[in-house]
Amino acid sequence: MARLRETYRNEIAPKLSEQFKYKSPMQIPRLSKIILNMGLGDAIQNIKILDSAAEELGMISGQKPVITRARQSIAAFKLRKGMPIGCMVTLRGDRMYEFFDKLVNVALPRVRDFRGVSSRALDGRGNYTLGIKEHIIFPEIDYDKIDKIKGMNITIVTTAKNDDEARTLLALMGMPFKQ
């Protein structure tokens, strides 16, 4: 079982229950899934970029990504409906907790000029979205073997009803918010 899941059950959940005065243990907010998305506009001209991005996203997440396709044609971008334009992974369970642990303790501290993540990136429904400009902050990526530095979006979906509960949950789990 993931280390962070144990910490959540034994320490974080009781603190949240005490702070927000929940009547039922099912009301306590928890992580439900983490979505990693890599949108690649360059994949229109060169499909090989998409293959390397999918391989790297698979190394970061520990599971095979699904290729995302264009929903509609956009002539200005020379994009046709159904063309592959990115890849994504949805993490749940132990893999989700292990990824979150790695993100907070290993990857984010490796970001250049890192002073914490914005606490304003919550969406009002308890979900947090984080944009990363360089995927090389993850320890699985070998800097010598990559052809191009790519960015990604990380969406952390929680069962929290509002931003305050989600912010408290993520802060207790170790998310380094700006002061």
From Swiss-Prot:
Disulfide bonds: none annotated. One of its GO terms (molecular function) is rRNA binding. The keyword Signal does not apply. Keywords: Ribonucleoprotein, Ribosomal protein, RNA-binding, rRNA-binding, tRNA-binding. One of its GO terms (cellular component) is ribosome. Signal peptide: none annotated. The keyword Translocase does not apply. GO terms for biological process: translation. Pfam families: Ribosomal_L5 (PF00281), Ribosomal_L5_C (PF00673). Belongs to the universal ribosomal protein uL5 family. NCBIfam families: PRK00010.1 (NF000585). Part of the 50S ribosomal subunit; part of the 5S rRNA/L5/L18/L25 subcomplex. Contacts the 5S rRNA and the P site tRNA. Forms a bridge to the 30S subunit in the 70S ribosome. This is one of the proteins that bind and probably mediate the attachment of the 5S RNA into the large ribosomal subunit, where it forms part of the central protuberance. In the 70S ribosome it contacts protein S13 of the 30S subunit (bridge B1b), connecting the 2 subunits; this bridge is implicated in subunit movement. Contacts the P site tRNA; the 5S rRNA and some of its associated proteins might help stabilize positioning of ribosome-bound tRNAs. This is Large ribosomal subunit protein uL5.
